[in-house]
């Protein structure tokens, strides 16, 4: 438990800072652009991380939203209940996960449709010989063809959105103080460490996507959708009274409760 507490202390001192929340979006944009320049001008040699079957991609990135929801759900529930003691406020804050799920579903469906309507089936990866008889990506692949369309980077979108959402929700730790004897101490500490490491994985794999995969425009659009999903909620809608609200993070609990009143 001591090692876990040290990790939690380190993460509180890094990811929970307001400067991190303020600068992380710009850092992700800069990393995406820099990685894309490297990919275009001086491609890195093939490595384990450039293989789509690597462990982080298969077991984490492809399940990124599931991982994020599974860890944020108990974290939001425990920390917000610890601070407010009101089930109604906890449920209201948990609705952020429903909003995030809707954003994830709508964006991924949109990306899939864009790739479908802008794509064609080819005989080879070199885009030779259009196979007009195959009108969908699934049918094209089933018949051994290669589908090529405008493939907005789903990884760039989702990893951006998940990382920013976690950092926003962890801001509540400015107010959460539990000593070792508190019945929620172990659970919250464990969740802080898990969410912290998950955030580092998302940022690292975002960098790998920038360096190894997709064209610049595909990554720009993917990152842009992730930023819009984050800013449209935490930067705009959640500031309104009719919304899930922001995590409690004001100087006094009274002010925090007033913030969540309808």
From Swiss-Prot:
PANTHER family: ACYL-COENZYME A DIPHOSPHATASE FITM2 (PTHR23129:SF1)
Gene (name only): Fitm2
Full protein name: Acyl-coenzyme A diphosphatase FITM2
Database matches in Pfam families: FIT (PF10261)
Annotated family: Belongs to the FIT family.
Segments on the Lumenal side according to the record's topology features: 45-57, 115-145, 212-218
Domain of life: Eukaryota
Single GO term (MF): triglyceride binding
Disruption phenotype: Homozygous knockout mice display embryonic lethality. Heterozygous knockout mice exhibit shortened left ventricular end-diastolic dimension and shortened left ventricular end-systolic dimension. They also exhibit improved profiles upon pressure overload-induced heart failure.
GO BP, one annotated term: regulation of cell morphogenesis
Source organism of this protein record: Mus musculus (Mouse)
Location relative to the cell: Endoplasmic reticulum membrane
Cytoplasmic side: 1-23, 79-93, 167-190, 240-262
InterPro entries in alphabetical order: FIT (IPR019388), FITM1/2 (IPR046401)
Transmembrane segments annotated in the record for this chain: 24-44, 58-78, 94-114, 146-166, 191-211, 219-239
HAMAP family, per the entry: FITM2
This enzyme's EC code(s): 3.6.1.-
Gene Ontology cellular component terms for the protein in this record: endoplasmic reticulum membrane; mitochondrion
Expression sites (tissue/organ): Widely expressed, with highest levels in white and brown adipose tissues (at protein level). In the heart, mRNA expression levels do not correlate well with protein levels, suggesting post-transcriptional regulation in this organ.
Catalytic activity: an acyl-CoA + H2O = an acyl-4'-phosphopantetheine + adenosine 3',5'-bisphosphate + 2 H(+); (9Z)-octadecenoyl-CoA + H2O = S-(9Z-octadecenoyl)-4'-phosphopantetheine + adenosine 3',5'-bisphosphate + 2 H(+); (5Z,8Z,11Z,14Z)-eicosatetraenoyl-CoA + H2O = S-(5Z,8Z,11Z,14Z-eicosatetraenoyl)-4'-phosphopantetheine + adenosine 3',5'-bisphosphate + 2 H(+); hexadecanoyl-CoA + H2O = S-hexadecanoyl-4'-phosphopantetheine + adenosine 3',5'-bisphosphate + 2 H(+)
């Amino acid at each position: 438990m001591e090692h876990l507490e040290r990790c939690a202390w380190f993460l509180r001192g890094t990811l929970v800072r307001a400067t991190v929340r303020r600068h992380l979006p710009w850092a992700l944009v800069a990393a995406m652009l820099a990685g894309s320049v490297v990919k275009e001008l001086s491609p890195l040699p093939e490595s384990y991380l450039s293989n789509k079957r690597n462990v982080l991609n298969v077991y984490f990135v492809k399940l990124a939203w599931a991982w994020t929801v599974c860890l944020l759900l108990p974290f939001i529930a425990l920390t917000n209940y610890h601070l407010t003691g009101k089930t109604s406020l906890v449920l209201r804050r948990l609705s952020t996960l429903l909003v995030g799920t809707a954003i994830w579903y709508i964006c991924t469906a949109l990306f899939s449709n864009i790739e479908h309507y802008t794509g064609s089936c080819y005989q080879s990866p070199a885009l030779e010989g259009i196979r007009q008889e195959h009108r969908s990506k699934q049918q094209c692949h089933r018949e051994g063809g290669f589908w090529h369309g405008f493939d907005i980077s789903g990884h760039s979108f989702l990893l951006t959105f998940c990382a920013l959402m976690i950092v926003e929700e962890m801001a509540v730790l400015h107010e959460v103080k539990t000593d070792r004897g508190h019945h929620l101490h172990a659970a919250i500490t464990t969740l802080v460490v898990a969410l912290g490491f998950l955030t580092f994985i998302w940022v690292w794999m975002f960098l790998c996507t920038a360096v190894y995969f997709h064209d610049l425009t595909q990554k720009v659009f993917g990152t842009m959708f992730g930023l819009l999903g984050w800013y449209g909620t935490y930067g705009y809608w959640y500031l309104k009274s009719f919304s899930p609200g922001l995590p409690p993070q004001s100087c006094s609990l009274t002010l925090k409760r007033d913030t969540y009143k309808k």
